[in-house]
């Protein structure tokens, strides 16, 4: 396939045109008064969104050289989205500002390699400054503010705060379609797994067709139970306490199942048997999770624990167990809180190590069950288009909130980036030559997001920057929604530090790469041969 090449200034200008086309489409969405973008779909209804990465991903330019620039900006947005889940528009605006200023200097004769070094040094100092001003989340209110800013909706902020309140920082929160027009949070308390009672004879509530065991003992084993003899000692001990018994095993059949059912019907021992969740190695891990949550032991040959030797201390305990036809919920496990924390930390470490998305999801699910439950945000809307847009905003806001939990929060509205210029000033003083110019490029770019937020809201960015910098309070900024100057923390205009940091680092990375580009190579489009038209008359 023949190639076409572009060199030097001509190549860089083509890249810049591509960057500008994507950035100009994305930056209209920035801030509380940012607008939406409508994207045509080859099938189904069009997508309406104000999410930077969704817009960038849809843009494919006709000119192949310009398209290379567009793809690089997509990379900025995608990388920021992958790392922090939000801040994609900010990252795009920063990248455009750095590229514009950088290309001016390259055209004037600056050395691109030295410019890149200067950019990297300045960004390093700015990131240190961002980390310095970040504060830990102080409670539900902060979580609601972070989510509300990300989703541009106080209602969504409250929903996410409610969900996080219920499941904790490590809990799993999923987003699903609602069958109604309402958007609400559904919560599954305790540890739930998809296995129900083996026999309907165990049912205690015939109306709901479920088994309810109050303060039961829980026997956990990875074996198949069929012979009753090894179990008689422990069954007798449990019967003497008058408490019910839940049996979780690979399978329960034959004599054991008959014995449990008969004793339940006679009223000697209220019990229920369920199959162990999962398969293979995952089953072993989940049984161990249940054992730690309830303070019991897994009766397993691998661990050298025989059924005959089981004592009441080896059984798990819980406040309540509900078993339906195909699900079991253990509420209020009596396990040691320290052991549960250690288990959660262990699963967290596994999540960080794994590269498989499926593995990551199953580990997060296990962690959530140990941490206390799963929250589902059910999203309702009048039309399919609105539903898609709303779900997208909620997913973004969730990611932003998790990022805030990780690295804390900073004043929002572009203020933190603007004030990080103070740290860059010191770098500029220390550097010289083209490296100094590189640091100045970052200095100038750091004011781009706040300018864009102001312009999208109909204000003059330069005037607002001057007024903000006249006040030494690091949290002092401009509320573009109300058109007022205020303390950003007090007003709840906050961003996750991780989002702000990632946006800056990714923008600088791509800007540096683009400035040091000298040649562009693309495939030559094939010339379509014209097919002869049919004669008008036969």
Curated annotation (Swiss-Prot):
GO cellular component term, pick one: GroEL-GroES complex
Compartmental location: Cytoplasm
Reactions it catalyzes: ATP + H2O + a folded polypeptide = ADP + phosphate + an unfolded polypeptide
NCBIfam families documented for this protein: GroEL, PRK00013.1, PRK12849.1, PRK12850.1, PRK12851.1
Similarity annotation: Belongs to the chaperonin (HSP60) family.
Subunit note: Forms a cylinder of 14 subunits composed of two heptameric rings stacked back-to-back. Interacts with the co-chaperonin GroES.
Function: Together with its co-chaperonin GroES, plays an essential role in assisting protein folding. The GroEL-GroES system forms a nano-cage that allows encapsulation of the non-native substrate proteins and provides a physical environment optimized to promote and accelerate protein folding.
Name recorded for this polypeptide: Chaperonin GroEL
Organism: Thermotoga maritima (strain ATCC 43589 / DSM 3109 / JCM 10099 / NBRC 100826 / MSB8)
Taxon lineage: Bacteria, Thermotogati, Thermotogota, Thermotogae, Thermotogales
Gene: groEL
